[in-house]
A protein has these predicted regions:
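Catalytic-site signature of metal-activated, phosphate-bearing donor transferases
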Residues: 2-164
Length: 165
């Protein structure tokens, strides 16, 4: 957390105008800030009154639901979630398994387009439309591993339906 964000949080808590506050995250990957790839607009609620907010039941990427007014803090939160490539891919593997379980619990069955179209679309969307290409090699790595994670999600879902480990 930066000094500026810390000061803003302290100031906000002295006279809160909302029950929850979004913080824009500054995404870093493999030692460099990612400015595109669809990750530049990442914001999450990180400051909230627990009496008016609750997380949903998602197994991964839980969402905090605020029952009241929200606002956004001005300062950004540096986000260093993936310190190494291996750390990033390990997290993608865990998330793909959890997302597959969520789909399985909803009764969604994998179809051919899940294996072919969805990963391809994820890569094209993240690398070209969300300008990951402007993040250089890191943008390519993020788009490629993200697309593979989508593919792996549906392989995991297919395995769940067949009771294969």
């Amino acid at each position: 957390i930066t000094k500026q964000l810390s000061q803003e949080i302290i100031s906000t808590l002295k006279d809160p105008k909302a029950i929850a506050y979004y913080v824009n995250r500054e995404f870093h990957f493999m030692g460099k800030q990612i400015k595109f790839s669809g990750l530049q607009n990442d914001n999450v609620i990180r400051l909230f009154n627990k009496n008016y907010c609750a997380y949903n039941d998602n197994l991964v990427h839980e969402v905090l639901k605020a029952n009241g007014k929200t606002a956004t803090l001005k300062n950004k939160l540096p986000h260093y979630t993936y310190t190494t490539f291996d750390n990033y891919t390990a997290k993608m593997h865990r998330y793909s398994a959890l997302k597959a379980k969520m789909l399985y619990n909803k009764g969604i069955k994998p179809k051919g387009y899940h294996f072919f179209f969805r990963p391809w679309y994820r890569f094209i969307n993240q690398y070209f439309f969300k300008l990951g290409i402007l993040d250089g090699k890191r943008g390519f790595i993020l788009a490629y591993t993200s697309a593979f994670s989508v593919f792996k999600r549906y392989v995991n879902l297919w395995l769940l339906y067949r009771n294969i480990k």
